[in-house]
Amino acid sequence: MRVLGIETSCDETGIAVYDDKLGLLSHKLYSQVKLHADYGGVVPELASRDHVRKIVPLIKQALLDANTSANELDGVAYTKGPGLIGALLVGACVGRSLAYAWGKPAVGVHHMEGHLLAPMLEDDAPEYPFVALLVSGGHSMLVKVDGIGRYEVLGESVDDAAGEAFDKTAKLMGLDYPGGPRLAKLASEGVPAGYKFPRPMTDRPGLDFSFSGLKTFTANTIMAEPDDHQTRANIARAFEEAVVDTLAIKCRRALKQTGYNRLVIAGGVSANTRLRETLAELMTSLGGRVYYPRGEFCTDNGAMIAYAGLQRLKAGQVEDLSVKGQPRWPLDSLPAVD
């Protein structure tokens, strides 16, 4: 089976063609970072309009790169949610329309399921079952995964997600958008300097996350300390270590609770070097293993949507002719793939 995947949930237009026998045949990505940089964050209306401009040329190029015609496709997968409704509808309208015109089935994919399954694009993919840590700008969650669609959310963010906390803290430090990667780079120049940052919600049972208080603590520290580069770097490191330690503590608890020894990390924050190193050390100490996608598949992309969509199309799950977007969509409400 060969599927065209379309991702437009936020500020990246991602298109890919995936074949269940040959693997990933093409992968195109356009990022709107420069478009939104002057605003310090994503402007939904601008994001939607830019998707409209870029999506069809990218689809044509992806098919050309994959040496695939519409007749050779077996289906179309597009991100149905969660995300920005305007951006979602661009991908849904184009994906559903092309599928109808080509006489192919279409399926709407859950964006976070795409991230969760992104490590399956690698040669050394994890086997089920495993615990997944999904960390992005909009989500932080721990999920017990027993198969595709067999998900139990063990814990999630009750306010700011990890990626959101990175971006907001970076803005407090005067760093340009997108702030998360820039804050991580600044943190790499920092040294432990006696700052004692909290590890939120680790002093109580449970697997939920909360990073808004840590963000406020960091803001107060910034205002109280000298405004020089090294001090900012030290604060950035203390903040990053607090986030990473919190995520690691919760992962350890989730692994103990489930009895699993495989951990998957995915989503934009999974590209963070300190997080990868810390979780690798954790899994080594537990006699387990951590898996994550390559860097280009940590952020939003069409490849993960094509892969996830193919699994559901193979199981006979298809959309009707209506075009729908779901800005909010619980991951554990998805049907299982037998």
Swiss-Prot record:
It holds the Pfam family TsaD. Its main location: cytoplasm. It catalyses: L-threonylcarbamoyladenylate + adenosine(37) in tRNA = N(6)-L-threonylcarbamoyladenosine(37) in tRNA + AMP + H(+). It comes from the Bacteria. Fe cation binds at H111, H115, D300. Substrate binds at L134, V135, S136, G137, G138, D167, G180, N272. It is found in: Cytoplasm. GO terms for cellular component: cytoplasm. It is an enzyme of class 2 (transferase). PROSITE patterns: GLYCOPROTEASE. NCBIfam families: gcp_kae1 (TIGR00329), T6A_TsaD_YgjD (TIGR03723). Belongs to the KAE1 / TsaD family. Required for the formation of a threonylcarbamoyl group on adenosine at position 37 (t(6)A37) in tRNAs that read codons beginning with adenine. Is involved in the transfer of the threonylcarbamoyl moiety of threonylcarbamoyl-AMP (TC-AMP) to the N6 group of A37, together with TsaE and TsaB. TsaD likely plays a direct catalytic role in this reaction. This is tRNA N6-adenosine threonylcarbamoyltransferase.
